[in-house]
């Protein structure tokens, strides 16, 4: 937990520290608490510090992104490994969305591996808390109550929809994605 929170705070300036988040998180835990609740507690602890220093919004968003990626991918993935995780996940995500009748079958005609390779995982670090929470609550696709979409996949999905009728669909989708994300 300490390491996860330290990573979320890294690069955000000297005033954004992991220790207050860890301390508040630990205060709200009890014996036998499930890991999902531990992660939620860390998000809530970080969120309370946004008023003190607005840069905590980025640390909070990074903690939220971790819980979203765990929900979508079904496992912990370090941010450094998210580029490959996106490549591996993206074709299956489109297929799952089509199978659930949430996405148009025409999206399966794209070169999904090429589009997955174009996703920029480091852009997930640019979200503030409110922006990422809004995407999660309102826009990310879900099957039942489980989200199946990650932020960069969301932007690429929108880009694919915009480029359905283009001659070089993949190139145009990547161009649109670059603008959107």
Can you say where each PLM-predicted feature lies in the sequence?
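Extended catalytic cores of very large enzyme megasubunits
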Residues: 1-181
């Amino acid at each position: 937990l300490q390491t996860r929170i330290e990573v979320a705070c890294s690069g955000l300036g000297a005033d954004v520290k992991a220790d207050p988040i860890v301390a508040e998180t630990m205060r709200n835990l009890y014996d036998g608490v499930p890991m999902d609740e531990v992660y939620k507690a860390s998000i809530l602890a970080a969120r309370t510090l946004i008023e003190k220093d607005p840069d905590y919004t980025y640390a909070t968003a990074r903690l939220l992104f971790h819980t979203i990626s765990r929900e979508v991918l079904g496992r912990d993935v370090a941010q450094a490994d998210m580029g490959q995780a996106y490549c591996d996940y993206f074709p299956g995500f489109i297929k799952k969305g089509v199978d659930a009748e949430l996405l148009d079958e025409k999206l399966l005609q794209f070169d999904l591996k090429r589009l997955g390779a174009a996703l920029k995982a480091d852009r997930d670090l640019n979200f503030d808390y409110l922006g990422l929470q809004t995407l999660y609550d309102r826009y990310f696709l879900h099957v039942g109550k489980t989200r199946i979409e990650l932020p960069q996949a969301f932007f690429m999905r929108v880009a694919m929809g915009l480029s359905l009728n283009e001659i070089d669909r993949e190139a145009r989708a990547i161009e649109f994605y670059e603008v959107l994300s």
